[in-house]
């Protein structure tokens, strides 16, 4: 929260016309938090595979409690995917963030707001990520697999953004916030 506050103040001081977030989910989340109060458009350049760059959702952990906010001002206006920027992401973190994207897609299949189009996107995301992640763990420099993982994450984030969070995320946020996971 303090980082977001400082970021908003700095953006105001320099008269920024957008918030650029390059990195994983926490960095993308910081960009969202800055945009929430400042209404700056977000340019997101993800370097992991969870897909949060495609959602208007922000998770905040404060005093051991994880909460989420949903606001259209936090949906990045532009997302740039560049698989080259993921090449230094260790294979283990690649697999972890990709599994998070798969969890987003599975969740979209049973969410209350699920629909046939989102289900097709979720199934494609799961298929692509299930193929790409083992390739990345075997060869972390496999650019084609990393590009496929970004495609799968894009789909997964789109699913989560469309249907919102279901049981899986609610449990993870409760346990994660409570036990600092």
Q: Where are the regions a protein language model picked out?
A:
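Active-site segments that bind and position negatively charged phosphate/pyrophosphate groups
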Residues: 108, 112-181
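Gly/Ser/Thr-rich beta-alpha loop segments that engage phosphate groups in nucleotides
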Residues: 25-27, 31, 48, 53, ...
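Short, contiguous clusters of charged residues that form electrostatic/catalytic patches at enzyme active sites
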Residues: 2-9, 100, 104, 127, ...
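General beta-strand structural signal in soluble alpha/beta enzymes
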Residues: 20, 44-45, 81, 151, ...
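N-terminal small/polar loop signature for handling phosphorylated ligands or for N-terminal nucleophile
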Residues: 1-41, 135-146
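A glycine/threonine-rich phosphate-anchoring loop and its flanking beta-alpha core
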Residues: 36-120, 124-125
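Short glycine-rich loop/turn motifs that provide flexible caps or phosphate-binding loops at active sites
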Residues: 20-24, 50, 58, 97, ...
């Amino acid at each position: 929260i303090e980082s977001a506050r400082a970021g908003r103040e700095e953006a105001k001081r320099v008269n920024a016309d957008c918030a650029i977030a390059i990195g994983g989910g926490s960095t993308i989340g910081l960009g969202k938090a800055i945009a929430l109060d400042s209404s700056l458009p977000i340019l997101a350049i993800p370097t992991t595979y969870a897909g949060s760059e495609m959602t208007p959702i922000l998770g905040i952990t404060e005093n051991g409690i994880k909460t989420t906010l949903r606001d259209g001002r936090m949906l990045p206006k532009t997302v740039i995917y560049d698989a080259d920027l993921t090449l230094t992401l260790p294979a283990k973190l690649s697999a972890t963030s990709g599994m998070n994207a798969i969890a987003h897609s599975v969740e979209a299949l049973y969410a209350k707001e699920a629909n046939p189009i989102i289900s097709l996107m979720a199934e494609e995301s799961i298929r692509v990520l299930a193929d790409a992640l083992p390739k990345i763990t075997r060869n972390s420099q496999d650019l084609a697999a990393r590009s496929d993982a970004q495609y799968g994450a894009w789909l997964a984030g789109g699913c989560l953004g469309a249907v919102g969070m279901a049981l899986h995320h609610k449990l993870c946020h409760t346990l994660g916030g409570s036990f600092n996971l």
